[in-house]
């Protein structure tokens, strides 16, 4: 692919490729339910050529002087633009198949690599530590991305699609910037951390005390209890998906591009996430747009009860979630966008129906 690198405002580097023509999106949702049986063929004949010829990649420099990377695909005569806020550990490279599916339904798509992961700059010496000082750093990066990159290229409706940690970032974003998105989709949103048998108030106190102590002795936030560097567990032991094909492809991408690899979270990240979630739930009255919450029935990564509480509270505030409660995806693990064909196609069908509904 030939790329033209441009120097724009805020030191934006952009790799330009051919836009998707409107005539190209005639994607049948029925195809989504039978893709795994020929997944290697799909990757070689469809996804790889699409990613190489249709996807634009670039970066901008944020207020902390960090390089924030992103990718996008513009669709001619798009019915809207989807901004993807990925989960922890993720970058746009992990979203290749989802980006493809969204464009085939007529949406332009923009994906950000949050700071500290993907191809974006990492703040600690050990690049595999999951760290952020404050979730508002993520939120400000996302706003710069939307303001300086997305909106100059798309003047129509914007939709937020977020996953896991990206859901916590996305929730804080729509609370602080209520007029940017028309609708928001939250997939397995990280609105509650599993503290095990320890009551949450006590766990929060422990997190804060330990984090305070570690900041006295080092500016390199240590791994949270039991944390380690990048560890690609075998499929049989994974907590993310029941799709062996998609899991293996995701891991192969991270092997091919080691800069994407990220390990466990740090005490600093835990403190920042707990504070962000607490603030978000205190400000649910600021959520004004239509929202859909997709919940994985067998999620072992985050706490589903927090999603139930979110929709319950929004209903009391007069802005109920679609279906009034989280939409439970049966037989699905945490990563709905790389799940097996049946739950994944159900997820996409619900998203497309929600976004296309004018009510």
Residues covered by each model-derived region:
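Active-site glycine-rich loops that stabilize anionic/oxyanionic intermediates
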Residues: 79, 85-90
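Conserved alpha/beta-hydrolase
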Residues: 92, 99-125
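Alpha/beta-hydrolase active-site loop
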Residues: 130-150
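Short alpha-helix in the alpha/beta-hydrolase fold that links the catalytic acid
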Residues: 289, 303-313
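Catalytic active-site module of serine/aspartate enzymes centered on a nucleophile-bearing elbow/loop
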Residues: 318, 323-359
């Amino acid at each position: 692919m030939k790329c033209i690198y441009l120097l724009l405002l805020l030191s934006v580097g952009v790799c330009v490729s051919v836009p998707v023509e409107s005539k190209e999106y005639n994607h049948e949702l029925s195809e989504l339910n039978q893709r795994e049986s020929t997944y290697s063929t799909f990757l070689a004949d469809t996804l790889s050529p699409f990613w190489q010829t249709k996807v634009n990649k670039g970066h901008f420099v944020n207020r902390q002087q960090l390089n924030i990377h992103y990718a996008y695909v513009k669709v001619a005569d798009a019915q809207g633009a989807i901004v993807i806020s990925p989960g922890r550990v993720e970058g746009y490279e992990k979203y290749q198949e989802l980006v493809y599916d969204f464009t085939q339904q007529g949406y332009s798509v923009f994906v950000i690599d949050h700071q500290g992961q993907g191809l974006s700059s990492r703040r600690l010496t050990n690049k595999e530590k999951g760290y952020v000082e404050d979730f508002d750093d993520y939120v400000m990066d996302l706003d710069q991305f939307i303001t300086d990159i997305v909106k100059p290229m798309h003047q129509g409706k914007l939709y937020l699609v977020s996953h896991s940690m990206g859901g916590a970032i996305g929730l804080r974003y729509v609370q602080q910037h209520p007029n940017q998105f028309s609708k928001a989709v939250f997939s397995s949103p990280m609105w509650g951390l599993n503290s095990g048998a320890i009551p949450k108030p006590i766990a929060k106190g422990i997190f804060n005390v330990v984090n305070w102590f570690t900041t006295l002795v080092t500016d390199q936030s240590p791994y949270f209890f039991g944390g380690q560097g990048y560890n690609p567990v075998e499929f049989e032991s994974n907590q993310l998906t029941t799709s062996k094909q998609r899991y293996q492809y995701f891991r192969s991408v991270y092997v091919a591009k080691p800069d994407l690899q990220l390990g466990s979270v740090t005490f600093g990240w835990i403190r920042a996430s707990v504070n962000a979630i607490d603030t978000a739930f205190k400000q649910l009255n600021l959520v004004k747009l239509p929202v859909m919450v997709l919940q994985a029935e067998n999620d072992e990564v985050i706490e589903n009860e927090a999603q139930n509480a979110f929709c319950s509270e929004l209903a009391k505030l007069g802005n109920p979630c679609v279906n009034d409660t989280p939409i439970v995806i049966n037989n699905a693990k945490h990563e709905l966008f790389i799940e097996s064909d049946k739950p994944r196609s159900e997820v996409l069908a619900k998203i497309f129906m929600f976004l296309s509904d004018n009510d």
